[in-house]
Amino acid sequence: MEDVIPAKRTFGRTIMETRKELGLSQKELAAHIQREDGTPISNQYLNDIEHDRRSPTGRHLIEQLAKVLKLGPDYLFFLAGQFPEDVRRHTPDPEHFAQAWSAFRRSLKDGGKR
């Protein structure tokens, strides 16, 4: 029997899969996500995000996507390659950061079983 390799978890794939699980169309989700000027994002922009052709341009977009899709914003920030604002404000010295990052990696490897 052949092993199935799971698809890589990406920001776009997570947005698309969760949107579909909630029964939302791209048009419906795009209407709920607003740019900084208050206008909704376009269906095409959301499509590009979902297919990992573009990244969200602002932290506020990630926070809105998390809220509408009922996802943890920290998880979306992680998938987008960003740190949440509260973490960025409290950046420790390099040694403390290395220790925290190492602990984070260990936690991911052992599935949080510690």
PLM segments and residue spans:
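A short, Lys/Arg-rich alpha-helix, primarily the initiator
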Residues: M1-G23, A31, S102
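Short, solvent-exposed amphipathic helices
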Residues: Q64, Y75-F78
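Short, basic-rich loop-to-helix N-cap that marks the start of a DNA-contacting helix
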Residues: P40, H51-K67
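Interfacial/linker helices and their anchor residues that mediate assembly or domain coupling
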Residues: A80-R114
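DNA major-groove recognition helix of helix-turn-helix
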Residues: I33, E50, L61, A80
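Short alpha-helical DNA-recognition segment
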Residues: G23-D48
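The DNA-recognition helices of helix-turn-helix-type DNA-binding domains
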Residues: E36-D37, R53, A80-P84
